[in-house]
Amino acid sequence: MELKFNIYKDSWMDNGLENFFRILKNLNSCNIELTDTSIKLKIKNKENFIKELIKKIIHEKRQNLLIIEKDEKTGEIKEIKKDHLILQEEKKIGGKVTFKEDLYKPEKTPEIVSKIFELKKGKTRCILCGRAFDKAVKKLQQANYPFVTKIASLSGVRSYKDGRVLSLREYYDNLCPFCYLIGILEWTDDALIYRTFPGDKSFLFLPYFANLRELHDFKKSCIYFGILNNTARYSNICVYPNTNDVENTPGEYSTLLCFYEKFIANATDDVIANNWAILQIPFGAVKNVKIDFINVKEGVLGTIREVYKNGQNFNYIYKELFNKIYFFSENKNTIDWEQTRDIQENLSKAFLLDDFRDFTNCLLPRKGGYVFFSSEVRQALEELIFIWRWRRMGIPKEKLDAIKSVGNIIAKISRNNASLLYKMDKVRAVEEFWSVLREIARKIPGMDEKDLKMIKPTALDELIQLVKDVVKKEKDGWKEVRDLLVVYSSMYYAIDKMPKGGGNQ
């Protein structure tokens, strides 16, 4: 028996196809070949093949759906279904999870697998792969294809293809048995990242490649280098490779950035994913799955690599920089952890999406408090800014001194009223930019004598000349300078607010 499964150009099904390849790869009863656009399966002995596949599903793959935990009150060891799974369960029997899905019921698995491989040609065309078949095993539903929603007003598949949204009505009858199997088994994939926030939602990260071999190479590296711990319930990114401790990232983008750091540190030269479909799966009975499609530019990945390999003050952008930036509440006179985690998440998002404008906004002082960090973190932030933004403009590092000095001036003027700092942030045209610089110049003579000793007034002239030079090369280059000014102003504002703040610039 010979079968061919072509690439779907669909993030869920292509990851499922790659997972299916890894499941079958070590079975003795078949030969399987992976190409750029398909997998080719040759079954040598159908009876033995079905037995081997059943054993693989029951004794190995099913375990990837579960967490084993000890009940703190009774001491009983029990199974718990992973929170991100869109698989319904029945009442536990003896502390063991019982899935409603027959494929994952050990007593029903043989029957389902046998039915799937009894496929005969028919008049029905599969909605996902186009294969002609005679009889479905299951309808298209969230358990085998999570992009279908149960909410009637929002029904349809949330997927993008060739720039268009393709919508399917829910519960299609024409799903072929093979697509059902590939889709339902994808939940067992041990090469996917997940992050759960109890009682709220889970994120499931699906890498996307147009080439199945590249997808396989990437996921194989994730497994081989021990980056993921799939026995953990809420997060599966290991703090250190092949250990049980996992990262406690604050959100979607910080999780992805944290993963990239682990991958680059352990699989430096291997194939890496730029494109992701990230499923946001809510808690509760009705699950309207949202999807973010993310493309991480090569330049951003290059910055992560550069920092890891050659960083002078730090080697990890999330772990050693964003994760050590906090929000201090002046009202509470302590760290506001909710705001802190929001800022860490938003910094990660702005960086991964290469959005320096949003990045600078994260560092602005807010009502009732300000963003702060240690001198070591400040040095790391300056190095990141140079690698990520300044160097690509082809301007020497020493030219940053003028921006830093003017940022210090803005911070001193804004100490008791941050309106000037906000005004700089809101500048939208170069004429407004010059106007704010003139306002800064007018305010310098009225500064406290102590502050005057701690600033460099001539830095304004240096900055003006720098901006003129930048604009000659790139018309909108002044915007990058504006954003850098906001970063340094926010930085020195926080330093001044903290004990023993400020410094000669």
Regions found by a protein language model. Name each.
Residues 1-124, 135-137, 331, 345-346, ...:
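N-terminal alpha-helical interaction blocks
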Residues 77-231:
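Basic, glycine-/proline-tolerant helical and adjacent loop/strand elements
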Residues 24, 57, 113-120, 129, ...:
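Hydrophobic, Leu/Ile/Phe/Ala-enriched alpha-helical segments that form helix-helix packing faces
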Residues 3-7, 30-34, 39-43, 65-68, ...:
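Hydrophobic transmembrane signal anchors and adjacent membrane-proximal interface regions, especially
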Residues 220-475, 481:
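Intrinsically disordered, low-complexity regulatory regions
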Residues 178-182, 349, 383-384, 485-491:
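Extended low-polarity, hydrophobic cluster-rich segments
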